[in-house]
């Protein structure tokens, strides 16, 4: 008996061959469009339950959005709507349509852990201490959380956090790590103090290069001598006005799972630099060499490589600013819509350390694009909201694609960006399926 294979398994192995096997589809190596013969078009239309008006524009090696996500339900207290990826360490993401809020609720912010969080019963905010040290720290100091709150000016900002591996599940061949879809992103409101104010208080030597953190989480092995993660940012990033040490999220005390009682926020970079359960700040005179700073972690090849290649550690570069990206949050993928009315779509866009300048939408697989209404960010490093009305020419199967362009002209790619071994920085256009009926 032949082994059966799922659609995703076939496409992960060889998307072009899968196209031909599943749909009888031939691909143009130059345009990257797929040509469906009559039988293949009928097969895909039957599977989708509708005709495909712009089938000729559909990119090669791409699974239709209607089939691109399938989830088994799994509930966790306070995170009922998240999709579980693994449970040790606990990591979970939010489906795109549940990220529709302008300000992300705590219950819908993705969770990414590298170790075991501290036990809530053992955390007393009144006794929590933050040690500030390192080769480039002039006056090594220990501050209580209460002192942090009383010695420095408070700031409240809406700042986005995105996992460096958001979108990893779309890479072919598959990349190692949690198979995030599109939901490892959020933009809550945070309250705390600026890192630069704390650094000025303790004094920083002229040779300072990096600011790093350590947290109260434990290594998965249980070995107290090992740190599950200790990352950092260059000093210039740490002293930006938007780089904070925070204790509130959306006006409430930080939830334990999001770093209570206090954490760092260095928005626009991989969320792994925004350390949770903060108990130590290190001012370094070298590029920080803590856990998850070296090797392949949160690094990409310094030069483009062939998909599936093995890359030496010495040829990997640290990820800094995240790329331009967008998300469709309304409607939910798979929506049924009446042709006689316009479909209102909306979502968010962001661009690491930059700002999104324009947002475009397409309903014909990228053949044409229409400019959407794009709001300005409420503050630097907050995501931007956009909306657009779509009018369909006829009934059938459609996909809405969203493409953001940042303020220096960098645009989201229609298909997957450059492959890398760990599946970081996927900023391909987000898309949803729409069935239009008369």
Annotate the PLM regions.
Residues 61-438:
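Structured, non-membrane catalytic/scaffold regions adjacent to prosthetic-group chemistry
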Residues 29-30, 34-35, 109, 400:
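Short alpha-helical segments used as structural interaction elements across diverse proteins
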Residues 1-34, 56-58:
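N-terminal secretory signal peptides
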Residues 6-9, 47, 57, 81, ...:
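Acidic/proline-rich low-complexity IDRs
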Residues 1-2, 41, 132, 139:
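Contiguous N-terminal and early-domain "leader" segments and peripheral loops that mark the onset or edge
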Residues 28, 40-42, 65:
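Intrinsic disorder/low-complexity segments
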Residues 34-60:
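N-terminal export signals
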Residues 15-20, 24, 40-43, 87-98:
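N-terminal accessory segment at the very beginning of proteins
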């Amino acid at each position: 008996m032949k082994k059966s294979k799922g659609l995703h398994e076939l496409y992960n192995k060889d998307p072009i061959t899968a196209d031909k096997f599943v749909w009888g589809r031939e691909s143009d190596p130059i345009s990257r469009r797929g040509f469906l013969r009559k039988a293949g078009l009928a097969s895909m239309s039957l599977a989708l339950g509708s005709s495909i008006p712009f089938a000729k524009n559909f990119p090669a090696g791409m699974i239709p959005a209607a089939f691109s996500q399938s989830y088994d339900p799994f509930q966790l207290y306070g995170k009922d709507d998240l999709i579980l990826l693994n449970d040790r360490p606990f990591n979970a993401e939010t489906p795109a349509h549940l990220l529709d809020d302008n300000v992300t609720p705590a219950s819908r912010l993705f969770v990414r852990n590298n170790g075991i969080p501290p036990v809530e019963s053992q955390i007393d905010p009144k006794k929590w201490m933050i040690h500030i040290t390192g080769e480039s720290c002039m006056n090594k100091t220990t501050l209580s959380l209460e002192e942090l709150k009383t010695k420095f000016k408070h700031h409240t900002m809406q700042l986005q956090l995105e996992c460096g591996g958001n979108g990893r599940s779309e890479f072919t061949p598959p990349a190692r790590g949690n198979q995030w879809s599109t939901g490892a992103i959020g933009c809550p409101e945070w309250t705390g103090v600026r890192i630069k104010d704390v650094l000025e208080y303790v004094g920083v030597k002229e040779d300072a290069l990096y600011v790093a953190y350590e947290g109260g989480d434990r290594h998965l092995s249980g070995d107290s001598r090992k740190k599950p993660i200790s990352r950092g940012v260059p000093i210039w990033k740490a002293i930006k006005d938007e780089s904070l040490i925070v204790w509130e999220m959306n006006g409430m005390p930080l939830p334990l799972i999001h770093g209570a009682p206090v954490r760092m926020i260095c928005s626009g970079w991989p969320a792994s630099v925004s350390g949770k359960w903060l108990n130590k700040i290190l001012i370094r005179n070298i590029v920080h060499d803590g856990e998850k700073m070296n090797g392949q972690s949160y690094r990409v090849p310094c030069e483009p490589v062939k998909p599936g290649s093995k890359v030496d550690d010495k040829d990997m570069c640290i990820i800094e600013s995240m790329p331009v990206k967008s998300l469709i949050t309304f409607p939910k993928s798979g929506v049924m819509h009446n042709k006689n009315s316009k479909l209102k779509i909306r979502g968010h866009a962001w661009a690491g350390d930059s700002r999104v300048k324009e947002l475009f939408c397409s309903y014909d697989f990228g053949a044409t694009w229409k400019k959407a209404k794009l709001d300005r960010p409420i503050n630097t490093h907050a995501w931007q909201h956009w909306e657009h009305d779509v009018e369909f020419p006829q009934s059938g199967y459609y996909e809405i694609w969203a493409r953001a362009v940042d303020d220096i002209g960098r645009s989201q790619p229609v298909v997957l960006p450059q492959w890398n071994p760990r599946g970081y920085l996927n900023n391909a256009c987000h898309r949803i399926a729409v069935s239009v009926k008369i």
